[in-house]
Amino acid sequence: MLATAKTEVVVLTAQKWFPNPFQTQVVDQHIESRRALKYLGVTIDSKLTFRDQIVSVATRAATTVANLSRLMPNVGGPRSSCRRALMGVANSIVLYGVEIWGEALKVEKYRKQLASVQRRGALRIACAYRTVSEAAVLVISGVTPIDLLGHERKRIWDARRAGEGPLKDVRTREREETFALWQERWETGETGRWTYRLIGQIRDWVLRDCGEVDYYLTQFLAGHGQFNAYLHRMGIRNDPYCFYCPGVADSAEHTFFDCQRWSEIRLRWREEKEVPQRRSGEIRRNGGISCRSSVEGAWYCEVMLTRSRSIIRYKRGEGFSE
């Protein structure tokens, strides 16, 4: 028997002439239609735009990201792989029922609303400055863009309904399709170009079997950190020039590849024998980072930025020296 007191109605129509609200009678109860209602956890609106669903999950996910962020300081705290697993909770909230409403992600304003929440989580995973672009921080942290994840899940669901082979094969195929779409977006993007020079192939970077990003390595990969060119852009330094190379902008590229102040460290890194199984990897300024160099690269970047920070603080009169 229908419980009329608990009954809700939403009229699915795009016709402007249709009366809104619409009233109907069930038994002895008059029921007025609503603009949207929640059914099995998905908010359905009368025009099937799923705007209310996206606003709802974005708000809930933002709260989750904010709470988890308290566990993830820039220095210390969980490793990036653990951070990624924790932030997966926010993805689960956002992507619930995406097989039904996934087409709404093709609307740019809806995509941006969810991407904004995901970006905040990716910043915590990579321990990055908040000025790092969405494209760059997602690559550095290894987090697939939320709209591509949503479309992937919808394609998998459609393939299962069509009986297109074993689920494992379908998932593998669609994951490769997502990597291809992400790679195309990465290659044609306008932001994160320094990161693109270092991490050209997303699939290789995300699926690497060694190396964790942290506060120090992320500064190198993003180009946002203890570099005078960046600090000058943020209004912290009076000029963008290197302390040790007059007239040369102190960018991440200059610090890690050219600055004579760090030539001894660069040479020591190249000759280091402590990690022989990783020796075949290298970092190239235009050719990208070999995944096999991640362990060496993390050590190299941490030493470089720790020393750089000490020197910068000393120059600012805070009492830090080498």
PLM segments and residue spans:
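Short, conserved micro-motifs composed of acidic
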Residues: 2-35
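A glycine-rich phosphate-binding loop feature that marks nucleotide/adenosyl-phosphate handling sites
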Residues: 5-15, 85-86, 109-114, 136-143
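Basic, alpha-helical interaction scaffolds
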Residues: 29-101
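Acidic, serine/threonine/proline-rich low-complexity intrinsically disordered regions
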Residues: 100-112
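Two-metal-ion acidic nuclease core segments, chiefly of the RNase H-like superfamily
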Residues: 110-131
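Extended C-terminal regions of large enzymes
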Residues: 136-216
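Family-specific functional microsites
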Residues: 205, 210-322
